[in-house]
């Protein structure tokens, strides 16, 4: 399944938006338009559904309800999220999940549910608050989604949310993970424990994935070959990626992740994540640190890998090269436009001018990206 529709009210940048989604989506917009915050709604649902998480955990991780609530919210301050999961494009939703959150007016001002609703194949199977919730209001500080004893009727949906993965790999954190002390962000979004994650994968699966990644790497970095994973016993079992770098000597030189370029590490992280699971994958600017020629191949590569594994991919981007691929449909691009009353979200296919440009032979990138440039951006060149 994949998320086919999302409706947000008072979520961060978005006062009220609705978006139809495909298995592959590219999210574009100006800086601070809310691209990362749009992805964060799915991370929030993951934080609710995962073991050890929950509604209170997800809100606390984001600094409370106030930072989550849209600044444009006025008379109706509740935060509301609705998502639909479908088996295929155009199919009726297999699942629908709705949640409304508000804050206590007095006391410790704890966030609680104004409602929680679930539909399966069009039939409503959960509608909170229930009578027991009215008798014990503390129950509304937890969702049924997060509780094993209450989510059995929609556990497949809960598992989908639990499997959501976010990746914005920071190469320096991969290279020097042991030098950064402290627990780090929940869910390891920046790849500090990326090598540990590879190490926890069963050996047969790990070797198979690394072999596939090696094939892709040799196309992008012809000098690299024989990508392997190892733990250095001399260093106390620290995990490493290692590859042979071809040069004038007959056997090349062995290099570890500390010698890999930023682009190589980010490409390894991207490919591993695409091969790793079958739930939603959230990518933050996958084009970073990569050569323009490689970036042009990302969209078709993502399509081929996700099609095999049924994985939905949502990616933010500023890259004209990434969006230059002729295989990207306007239905796969969301344009975020900041406005006085919150960011507006519109499908590129719903913009008449974009459709006309595509009909004239332009790429999605050429048709959409100029709309993301702020009106006064050219004046930056006059700054002194």
Positions of the model-derived regions?
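Short acidic, glycine-rich loop/turn motifs
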Residues: 10, 83-90, 120, 245-249, ...
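C-terminal lobe/lid and adjacent interdomain/linker elements of RecA-like ASCE P-loop ATPase modules
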Residues: 1-2, 297-384
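N-terminal pre-Walker A segment at the start of P-loop NTPase domains
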Residues: 1-15
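Conserved ABC ATPase signature
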Residues: 210, 215-218, 225-275, 280-293
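Phosphate-binding glycine-rich loops of NTP-binding sites
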Residues: 23-62, 190-193, 267-273, 291, ...
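Electropositive, glycine-dotted interaction segments
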Residues: 89-228
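Conserved P-loop NTP-binding catalytic core
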Residues: 40-106
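ABC ATPase nucleotide-binding domain
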Residues: 18-20
């Amino acid at each position: 399944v994949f998320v086919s529709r999302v409706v947000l009210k008072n979520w961060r940048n978005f006062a009220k938006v609705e978006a139809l989604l495909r298995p592959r989506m590219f999210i574009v917009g100006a800086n601070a338009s809310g691209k990362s915050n749009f992805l964060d709604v799915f991370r929030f649902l993951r934080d609710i559904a995962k073991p050890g998480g929950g509604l209170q955990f997800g809100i606390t991780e984001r600094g409370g309800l106030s930072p989550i609530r849209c600044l444009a919210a006025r008379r109706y301050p509740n935060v509301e999220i609705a998502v639909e999961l479908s088996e295929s494009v155009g199919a009726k939703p297999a699942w629908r999940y709705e949640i409304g959150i508000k804050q206590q007016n007095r006391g410790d001002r704890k966030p609680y549910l104004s409602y929680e609703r679930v539909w399966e194949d069009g039939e409503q199977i959960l509608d909170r608050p229930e009578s027991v919730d009215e008798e014990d209001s503390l129950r509304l500080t937890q969702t049924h989604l997060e509780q094993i004893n209450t989510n059995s009727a929609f556990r497949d949906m809960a598992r989908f949310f639990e499997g959501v993965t976010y990746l914005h790999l920071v190469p320096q954190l991969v290279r020097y993970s042991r030098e950064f002390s402290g627990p780090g962000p929940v869910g390891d979004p920046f790849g500090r424990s990326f090598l540990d994650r590879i190490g926890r994968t069963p050996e047969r699966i790990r070797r198979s994935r690394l072999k596939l990644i090696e094939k892709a790497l040799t196309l992008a970095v012809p000098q690299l070959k024989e990508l392997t994973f190892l733990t250095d016993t001399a260093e106390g079992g620290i995990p490493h990626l290692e590859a042979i770098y071809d040069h004038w000597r007959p056997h090349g030189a062995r290099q570890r992740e500390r010698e890999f370029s930023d682009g190589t590490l980010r490409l390894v992280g991207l490919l591993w994540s695409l091969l790793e699971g079958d739930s939603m994958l959230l990518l933050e600017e996958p084009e970073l640190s990569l050569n323009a020629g490689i970036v042009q191949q990302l969209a078709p590569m993502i399509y081929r890998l996700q099609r095999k594994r049924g994985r939905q991919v949502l990616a933010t981007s500023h890259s004209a090269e990434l969006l230059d691929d002729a295989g990207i449909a306007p239905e796969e691009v969301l344009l975020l436009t900041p406005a006085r009353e919150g960011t507006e979200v519109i499908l590129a296919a719903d913009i008449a001018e974009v459709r006309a440009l595509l009909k004239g032979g332009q790429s999605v990138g050429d048709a959409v990206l100029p709309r993301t440039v702020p009106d006064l951006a050219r004046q930056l060149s006059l700054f002194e």
